[in-house]
């Protein structure tokens, strides 16, 4: 069974994100557990934690259906020691927040070398950052998202994801999330069923489906292999609807959160309903 939803707002409290997901008739959702554009946030209170857990229970969302996202400020491959430390501390806080809320996944963008260190050195730092944080937490899997490769961001090649995983000691607590827009902008074709078959055969060969913990379902305003990250509504961009229909019919994508980050929240409910209908 597919878990399908969207990245919903947590404005007014994390429990409100659950309500918003339910209103969309979503079977999955993503959220930020704190303001994604700030380093620090007030600790989660017992009251907030309880409200979130009760809302999940009420609307029947299990941790397997929820894919929280970390702050955009974090760079686990930062070339500067002080900034790297700050990112690691912030990521540890994000993992702890997930643990407190009873969540088992945390999605994050791997990191950027900022033209100051080599790609290999940056990938090593990212793996080292994950090891440090996993050693200081329990029960939460670090989920690496592929990127479009804008600027000096790494993670746009499946080989980058494989290299990071290779450097992680506890492989039971590391996974990946594939964003369709990022993959397309990063040079992986998805414009036809045949292209999807080939792209995910490459994913299986280089990374492996055993590490797939989530998907971000986005069409692309950006051109193929442009290394530009611009999302679009399903069927409105350069990928087209065939890829999303194909994904819905492939059992390898069952049981993981599949999250819309498309550009028009007004049609999320319709997009979710369409995706559900394509499973047949």
Swiss-Prot record:
Q: What is its EC number?
A: 3.1.21.2
Q: What UniProt keywords apply to this chain's record, in alphabetical order?
A: DNA damage, DNA repair, Endonuclease, Hydrolase, Metal-binding, Nuclease, Zinc
Catalysed reactions listed for this entry:
Endonucleolytic cleavage to 5'-phosphooligonucleotide end-products
**What does the entry comment about cofactor binding?**
Binds 3 Zn(2+) ions.
List the NCBIfam families hit by this protein, alphabetically.
nfo, PRK01060.1-4
What task does this protein carry out? Endonuclease IV plays a role in DNA repair. It cleaves phosphodiester bonds at apurinic or apyrimidinic (AP) sites, generating a 3'-hydroxyl group and a 5'-terminal sugar phosphate.
What protein am I looking at?
Answer: Probable endonuclease 4
Organism annotation? Erwinia tasmaniensis (strain DSM 17950 / CFBP 7177 / CIP 109463 / NCPPB 4357 / Et1/99)
Tell me the name of the encoding gene. nfo
């Amino acid at each position: 069974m597919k878990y399908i939803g969207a990245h919903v707002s947590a404005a007014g409290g994390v429990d409100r994100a659950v309500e918003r997901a339910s209103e969309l008739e979503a079977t999955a959702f993503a959220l930020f557990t704190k303001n994604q554009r700030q380093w620090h946030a007030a600790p989660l209170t017992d009251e907030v934690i309880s409200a979130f857990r009760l809302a999940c229970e009420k609307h029947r969302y299990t941790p397997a259906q929820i894919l929280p996202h970390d702050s955009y400020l974090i760079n686990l491959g930062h070339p500067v020691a002080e900034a790297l430390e700050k990112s690691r501390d912030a990521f540890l806080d994000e993992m702890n927040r997930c643990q407190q809320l009873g969540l088992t996944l945390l999605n994050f963008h791997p990191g950027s070398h900022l033209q100051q260190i080599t790609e290999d050195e940056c990938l090593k730092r990212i793996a080292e950052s994950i090891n440090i944080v996993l050693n200081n937490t329990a029960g939460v899997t670090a989920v690496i998202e592929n990127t479009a490769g804008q600027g000096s961001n790494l993670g746009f090649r499946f080989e980058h994801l494989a290299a990071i995983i290779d450097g992680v000691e506890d492989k039971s607590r590391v996974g990946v999330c594939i964003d369709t827009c990022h993959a397309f902008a990063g040079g992986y074709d998805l414009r036809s069923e045949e292209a999807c078959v080939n792209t995910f055969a490459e994913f299986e060969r280089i990374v492996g489906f055993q590490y797939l913990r989530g998907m971000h379902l986005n069409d692309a305003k950006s051109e193929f292999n442009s290394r530009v990250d611009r999302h679009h509504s399903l069927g409105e961009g350069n990928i087209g609807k065939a890829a999303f229909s194909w994904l819905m019919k492939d059992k390898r994508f069952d049981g993981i959160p599949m999250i819309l980050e498309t550009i028009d929240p007004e049609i999320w409910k319709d997009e979710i309903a369409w995706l559900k209908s394509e499973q047949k």
